[in-house]
């Protein structure tokens, strides 16, 4: 039921815009933005190393498709990472807070 939705971008302004829109639309309770993620990946048959912003948003699984749509609309990558990670357990008060923020 509770999930973390994760994505990366190489632009600070994109990370902030995605975060703000998701919170404004009450799709997520909060977004943690980590500015120093070092990523190594293949793009157009070339190995690329890039500093990226990691975004982790706390929410519930019923919001995932709407979150995915927002990220796809605002993201600067051709194929952005948009994944869901299950929260198997947690502080009950924190999980209640997530519910209160998105409902």
Model-derived features: positions:
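Positively charged, small/polar-rich N-terminal and surface patches that mediate targeting and assembly
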Residues: 1-103
């Amino acid at each position: 039921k509770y999930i973390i939705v994760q994505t990366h971008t190489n632009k600070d302004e994109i990370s902030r815009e995605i975060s703000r829109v998701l919170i404004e639309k009450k799709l997520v309770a909060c977004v943690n933005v980590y500015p120093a993620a070092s990523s190594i990946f293949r793009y157009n048959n070339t190995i690329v190393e890039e500093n990226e912003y990691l975004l982790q948003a706390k929410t519930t699984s019923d919001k995932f498709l709407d979150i995915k749509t927002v990220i796809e609309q605002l993201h600067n990558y051709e194929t952005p990472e948009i994944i869901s990670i299950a929260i198997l357990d947690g502080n009950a008060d924190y999980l209640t807070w997530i519910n209160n923020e998105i409902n």
